[in-house]
Every structure is written in structure tokens, then in C-alpha cells.
Amino acid sequence: MAKNSNPSAFDRDFGYLMPFLDRVAAAASDLEDASARAELTRLMVEEKARWQRIQELLGGAGGRGAAAPTPAREAPAEAPRLARGSADELHEAAPFATGLTVGSLRGSR
């Protein structure tokens, strides 16, 4: 994978993204459902932290994780679930293959 030779290439995008995330987080306080308000607040804190870390990595910061895993010699008996930053069950991998859309999603006129 090529190294990003211009770390400021995404500055404009982050300039739009971070205020957007702040607006969504602020909108959480207007939710009537207390559990929804708490969940959205938590999700936005996690999301903003992820994007700040992405920005640091694009700027040249070193990685914190372990080295890339070596490929498995044998296929696992069951397909693993997708990794998530939080342990919610809303975004697990589908246990079956999904169809792909080919062609335009717009109807012909």
C-alpha cells in the first residue's frame, strides 16, 4: 500500500467531518428517549475518537496495535464475525452471502 505523501490531503475533509460529528453529538441531547440519548452520545464519542486517531495515523503517527496477523494455514470451521470498536450486536457479519447489484440503481426513464 502506498504511503500518503501529503498528510494534509484530507484536511479539508476532516474540516467538514469533525464539525458534523459535533452537530450529531449535540443533537443527541434533544432526544426524548434517555437510553437512545445515552447510546447516541456514547457512539459519537467513540466515532470521534476513531476519526481523530485516523487523522493522526494519516499524519504519520505510529500504529499502536500488534503486527499484521499471518495468514491462517487452514480455513476456520466457522466464518468469524466482523470486528467492531464496541461490542454491539447490530453490526455483525451476515452468516450468508448477499447478492450484488449490477448496473444502475436508478430506474430507467
UniProtKB/Swiss-Prot annotation:
The gene is encD. Cargo protein of a type 1 encapsulin nanocompartment. May help nucleate Fe atoms in the interior of the encapsulin nanocompartment. Present in about 47 copies/encapsulin nanocompartment. GO terms for molecular function: metal ion binding. It is found in: Encapsulin nanocompartment. Fe cation 2 binds at E47. Residues 61-94 are annotated as: Disordered. Residues 66-85 have a biased composition (Low complexity). This is Encapsulin nanocompartment cargo protein EncD. It comes from Myxococcus xanthus (strain DK1622). One of its GO terms (cellular component) is encapsulin nanocompartment.
